[in-house]
Design a protein with these regions (language model features):
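Helix-to-loop junction immediately C-terminal to a conserved catalytic motif
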Residues: 53
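Conserved ABC transporter NBD signature motif
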Residues: 61-69
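Short coil-to-helix segment of the ABC ATPase nucleotide-binding domain corresponding to the Q-loop/switch region
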Residues: 98-106
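Conserved signature/switch motifs of ABC ATPase nucleotide-binding domains
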Residues: 138-141, 159, 191
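Conserved ABC ATPase signature
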Residues: 139-143, 147-149
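Catalytic Walker B motif of ABC-type/P-loop ATPase nucleotide-binding domains
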Residues: 164-167
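Helix N-cap at the start of a conserved alpha-helix in ABC-type nucleotide-binding domains
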Residues: 175-177
């Protein structure tokens, strides 16, 4: 295990309602690394992501993210862990009753930001980063699916996370829009943020090659692009 690893999971066991989903799973992710997480529906991809952001406990084994001990993390530490993680879901989960800017402002204030000028500055920065600097006044329903997912990505970037966990981020998008989202995530990764992305879209994996880890039989297996995905 590298001392510089951002994420290190060693032989972890994770359960959901007493069912063992991950059984002896191990994974190491370095700073700035892009990793695809593949596997069948129900194989444990989402369970793995939930264990990293402390939504599901690690029953056995060892887990570390940065300075956090994921197995023994205390409830009061979880908000601080999640500030270092950006989380992206396929179903957007934007607040439908407020504008893009108000969605982003809500997250910043909920994570301790108070200075109005700094809040406005950070919102402008992330909207520019995802190419939607002119859409801040829009309501979520006025945006396309691709634009909504870009807003979700901008929300994940607000606190300058060390890693982004993306759970099927292109699942509800058409192929062209999905490719645009992958391109954006790759750019974010190239800028130094680690990306751990679960996907069923092997066309994306082949077109935008990166490290591949397969979830199967409760364990994690390194895959090569030339292997049968």
């Amino acid at each position: 295990m590298s001392e510089q690893a951002l994420l290190s999971l060693q032989n972890i066991i994770v359960k959901r309602e007493e069912n063992i989903i991950l059984n002896g799973a191990s994974l190491v992710v370095q700073p700035g690394e892009f990793v695809y997480l593949i596997g069948r529906v129900g194989s444990g991809k989402s369970t793995l992501l939930k264990s990293i952001y402390a939504d599901l406990p690690i029953s056995e084994g060892e887990g570390r993210f940065g300075d956090f001990d994921l197995k023994h993390i205390k409830r009061k530490q979880i908000p601080f862990l999640r500030r270092e993680l950006g989380i992206i879901f396929q179903d957007f989960q934007l607040l439908t009753d407020r504008s893009v800017v108000k969605n982003l402002e809500f997250v910043l204030r909920a994570t301790g930001w108070k200075d109005k000028k700094l809040i406005q500055k950070r919102i402008s920065e992330v909207l520019e980063q995802v190419g939607l600097e002119s859409k801040g006044y829009k309501m979520p329903h006025e945006l396309s699916g691709g634009e909504q997912q870009r807003i979700v990505i901008s929300r994940a970037l607000l606190n300058k996370p060390k890693m982004i966990l993306a759970d099927e981020p292109t699942g509800n998008l058409d192929p062209i829009t999905g490719e645009q989202i992958i391109t954006l995530l790759r750019e974010i990764g190239d800028a130094g943020t680690s990306i751990l992305m679960s996907t069923h879209n092997y066309a994306h994996v082949k077109k935008f090659p990166a490290r591949i880890v397969k979830v199967e039989g409760g364990k994690l297996q390194e895959m090569q692009l030339k292997q049968d995905l």
